[in-house]
Amino acid sequence: MTEQKRKIEKLTGVKGMNDILPQDAGLWEFFESTVKSLLRAYGYQNIRTPIVEHTQLFTRGIGEVTDIVEKEMYSFTDALNGEHLTMRPENTAAVVRAAIEHNMLYDGPKRLWYIGPMFRHERPQRGRYRQFHQVGVEALGFAGPDADAEIIMMCQRLWDDLGLTGIKLEINSLGLAEERAAHRVELIKYLEQHVDALDEDAKRRLYTNPLRVLDTKNPALQEIAQNAPKLIDFLGDTSRAHFEGLQRLLLANNIPFKINPRLVRGLDYYNLTVFEWVTDKLGAQGTVAAGGRYDPLIEQLGGKPTAACGWAMGIERILELLKEENLAPEQEGVDVYVVHQGDAAREQAFIAAERLRDTGLDVIFHCSADGAPASFKSQMKRADASGAAFAVIFGEEEVANGTVGVKALRGTGGDGEKNAQQTVPVESLTEFLINAMVASAEDGDD
């Protein structure tokens, strides 16, 4: 008896780290193109930092008593040199590290933006993944409320550009360090009076990071959090003036907002302004963008004291909203699919495809799937499935006569007839196709 072949195990991706397939990539490209145009309009420059950083960057920058550092980071020890490394869970600390390391602020403030994958070890659910993507901005060296207002208004302009509705702005002020210290004393006193009612997470944070107790999602603690001393009541004149200045600028630009005294954010580097853009269309994961001011962070990471603010938004959540509101654009096909029959025709077709690409047209040349010549019928089926506007047909007869067939697969051909096929001299092919596409586009606009 012959030995049966051992079945090879099929490998799959890591849970919570998703592939972006071709049918979805068009939506990603649409979003990326839209947001990049917006960032250029505000004078922001792209910065790209490594995915892996020293763990200390995040423990010092984000804060050791935070969910991200305590529970969510992908950290490991480099076997070669014993360095403690972490796959970035967010990118603000890394951008600040790069700005300090490369002395980027020596000649004045910088407006920077980034886009890329982040990593957090948490339970995957709708809109929340272990590998997720963010786009963010960092305005380094700007101290006034006008910078806060500008980065908030950038988000509003992006929602408008994408056609998104129902995303609401919540703002708060975390004040200055001495104001947070005074509030912390009173907050701990208040929470101690309710210690028996606190859950384990709140008890753990009571003396290490009590401000985060106010941000609890536990329904049983909502009343306690709601009645807790509010940080906004501890603000001094400078913090109040900054917060009021922000509100005036938002109102002057018709940006509606709600002041949420319990909005504290999950990272320790924030001060003064914090904000979130939230929606009720994504279930529990309602925050689509968030940010604020982090003036202490640059000094905290070894730079000179420098004011800064920024935001980050989760791309997957924005794309979910685009799908939810049927705003995803149709995926465009190529301009031309080149079909051929016979060896001489294949060679001429290959050359013609390259010449068409020289003019800026998007062209698919039919390649054999199994090495054997494909029938004309199967090639035309592939051409139609590709989404191409036109099929360009090279047959033996056409090659002998110095001509080529052109068939409109979408809309009308050069003579205005739907799905018409015409014979065109090879030397006139490019001009014919360009004119036919212009005519087809005009028909589509009518």
From Swiss-Prot:
Record-level GO BP terms: histidyl-tRNA aminoacylation
Compartment annotation: Cytoplasm
EC number in record: 6.1.1.21
GO molecular function, one term: ATP binding
Cysteine-cysteine disulfides: none
Keywords (A to Z) from UniProt: Aminoacyl-tRNA synthetase, ATP-binding, Cytoplasm, Ligase, Nucleotide-binding, Protein biosynthesis
Keyword Nucleotide-binding applies: yes
Catalysed reactions, semicolon-separated: tRNA(His) + L-histidine + ATP = L-histidyl-tRNA(His) + AMP + diphosphate + H(+)
PANTHER family: HISTIDINE--TRNA LIGASE, MITOCHONDRIAL-RELATED (PTHR43707:SF1), HISTIDYL-TRNA SYNTHETASE (PTHR43707)
Family assignment from sequence similarity: Belongs to the class-II aminoacyl-tRNA synthetase family.
Name this polypeptide is given: Histidine--tRNA ligase
